[in-house]
Curated annotation (Swiss-Prot):
The gene is ttcA. GO terms for molecular function: 4 iron, 4 sulfur cluster binding; ATP binding; magnesium ion binding; sulfurtransferase activity; tRNA binding. The lineage of its organism: Bacteria, Pseudomonadati, Pseudomonadota, Gammaproteobacteria, Legionellales. It comes from Legionella pneumophila (strain Paris). It catalyses: cytidine(32) in tRNA + S-sulfanyl-L-cysteinyl-[cysteine desulfurase] + AH2 + ATP = 2-thiocytidine(32) in tRNA + L-cysteinyl-[cysteine desulfurase] + A + AMP + diphosphate + H(+). It is an enzyme of class 2 (transferase). This is tRNA-cytidine(32) 2-sulfurtransferase.
């Protein structure tokens, strides 16, 4: 920890430490690979995790991994210098995913899905080859609630970014230690620390992304009620299956079995769901 930490730094240490404890993200002896993209979120994650590592008495390891995706204008000279000054073990790996994305995705369409899929495969492979059992990502509270809103509005399902996840290849645990942290605090901290931010020109050139629209919507609602963002985060931790409609999690069809009646009631379906199927149409 800094000799004289600012109020926002104390706040970040508190909420990151709380998330790690709440979800048992890091255990003694873990080798944690922190994905450092060069953005404010990942710089903050690496800095705070490094301070918590020192505070713990080095009970776990951290390693910074940066993927150079060969985007035009990429310059990691300042990033390399910063990592060297902090004495954080690291590697910057170059893989040209940029050309693949540009080739596969039509102009004007969102690159995020393919780009993240390619990046994820490289990250998992690197972690496996180098013996890292935990992969830390820099998603924060606002990322989680925006993803929730996007899933509901555009995909028709209720999902977000879990704080802790078993990787697709079942060989790693992915953690998001900043899941309680507000983006505005990260912005303040990044400014205080003067991180050598590397902009993502690939994403920044697409102004019409759904995520920006959803972020704007949540911000507008928060003007009227500042508790909206925290309420949305709380909703992710307070699921009530009986108040929803997913029959995989609640046995709506046979609720009659729980009735307290003097005599048992024989339940027989009047309608069959197949009678009401409408092909290729969503209610």
């Amino acid at each position: 920890m800094s000799s004289n930490p600012s109020s926002v730094e104390k706040k970040l240490l508190h909420y990151t430490g709380k998330a790690i404890a709440d979800f048992n993200m890091i255990q003694r002896g873990d080798r944690v690979m922190v994905c450092l993209s060069g953005g404010k979120d990942s710089f903050t994650l690496l800095t705070i995790l490094n301070q918590l590592r020192i505070k713990s008495g080095n009970k776990f390891e951290i390693f910074a991994f940066t993927l150079d995706q060969a985007q035009p204008g990429w310059n990691d000279a300042c990033l390399r210098q910063w990592l060297a000054e902090k004495s954080i073990p690291h590697e910057i790996l170059t893989r040209d995913t940029y050309s693949i994305v540009k080739e596969k995705i039509p102009e004007g369409k969102t690159y995020c899905s393919l780009c993240s899929r390619l990046r994820r495969g490289i990250i998992y492979r690197y972690a496996e080859e180098n013996g890292f059992n935990k992969i830390a990502l820099g998603h924060h509270r606002d990322d989680l609630i925006r993803t929730l809103m996007m899933s509901i509005l555009y995909n028709g399902d209720i999902r977000s970014m879990p704080p802790k996840l078993l990787s697709d290849n079942k060989k790693h645990i992915v953690i998001r230690p900043l899941c309680y942290v507000q983006e505005k605090d990260i912005i303040t901290f990044a400014s205080e620390q003067a991180f050598p931010i590397i902009p993502c020109n690939l994403c920044g050139s697409q102004e019409n992304l759904m995520r920006k629209k959803v972020a704007s919507l949540i911000d507008q609602l928060a003007i009227e009620n500042p508790k909206v963002p925290s309420n949305m985060l709380h909703a992710l931790q307070s699921l009530k299956p009986s108040q929803l409609m997913d029959q995989n999690f609640w046995n709506f069809k046979n609720l009659e079995d729980g009735l307290e009646t003097a005599q048992s009631i024989q339940c027989e379906e009047v309608f069959n769901a197949q009678e009401f199927e409408i092909e290729d149409e969503k209610i």
